[in-house]
Amino acid sequence: TSRGLGDVYKRQAPVFSKLFPDIPRDHPVTGSIFMNLSANLLGLDNAATPMGLKAMQQLQELNPNKESASNSMVMFLCINASGLTLIPITIMMYRAQLGAANPSDVFLPIMLATFTSTLVAILAVCVRQKINILQRNLILFFGGLGLFIGGLVWLFNSMEQEQVSLYSTLFANTLLFTIICGFIISGMRKKINVYDAFIEGAKEGFQTAITIIPYLVAILVGIGVFRASGAMDFIIQGVRFGIASIGLNTDFVEALPTMLMKPLSGSGARGMMLDAMNTYGADSFVGRLSSIVQGSCDTTFYVVALYYGSVGIRNTRYTVQCALLADLAGAIAAIAMAYLFF
């Protein structure tokens, strides 16, 4: 599969070279970055992490200041933290388990929301790093994606709700099946033992996990204090009062726990999402919105602690600011998509 993804990467190399100008041409880290982002696109979080950690180690080798994040690290982390996901397999699985009539009805809203958060993350980092976003390759790539997403919004917005559910499900299932078959066929053509390759990667991932445990303990303790202090409940009630006071719809406020927890803890946000679906129903507005939020961005502080901690980076520069801006954009887009589709 790595060689197959490498073939796809070669087609996107002009875009990568613009976003990561400090990485030498044909350096192995480009393949690791692309494989990590590809795994995230497929919703394979556990598979993406070892690839991402390997990419960080390779980026650290290129980094002249071993304690401060390089420009390439910041760009990579912000894209990662934006949670770019094409097929939210886990979320659809939870929705099915909790009795959703159509577990994949959130597929398209999630894709639109996560595209928004990723685009904001890239633009924010480009501005900070003074990367010219008007370069031809970037305009063609992101302009094409924007037109594709905009076209989908227009198409599905003109359909009845039953048609939206039918065609979004068909699109997701067809795409997933095609990708899986593509990996298998690519492996057979190149005589790669995919299972053995997976086992070797798992061994490396286990060794890395031992290295990062202290950093994870620190971030999880901080999350626990925030939850136990009641600060989250205070924020939610304040937002509800503010929204109601200006006469706006407050239905989305019940999904705020998932939005607030998402940048801090993936398991915490997942628990908030499941709690919302159990309380209000998997097919309720709140249940669907919580699912969209869960898929629209990633756990920023967890990703930063995990990835930077694995290579000993202490100065993260503006990574957190840009990633949180992307999280905010993803949350706003998730709310907009929920009102649009449901």
Segments predicted by a language model, with ranges:
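Juxtamembrane loop-helix boundary motifs flanking transmembrane segments in multi-pass membrane proteins
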Residues: 11, 29-30, 47, 51, ...
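Hydrophobic alpha-helical transmembrane segments of multi-pass integral membrane proteins
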Residues: 16-52, 217-235, 240-276
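Membrane-interfacial loop-to-helix junctions in multi-pass transporters
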Residues: 18-31, 62-70, 168-175, 206-214, ...
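C-terminal transmembrane helix pair
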Residues: 48, 55-96, 100-130, 256-342
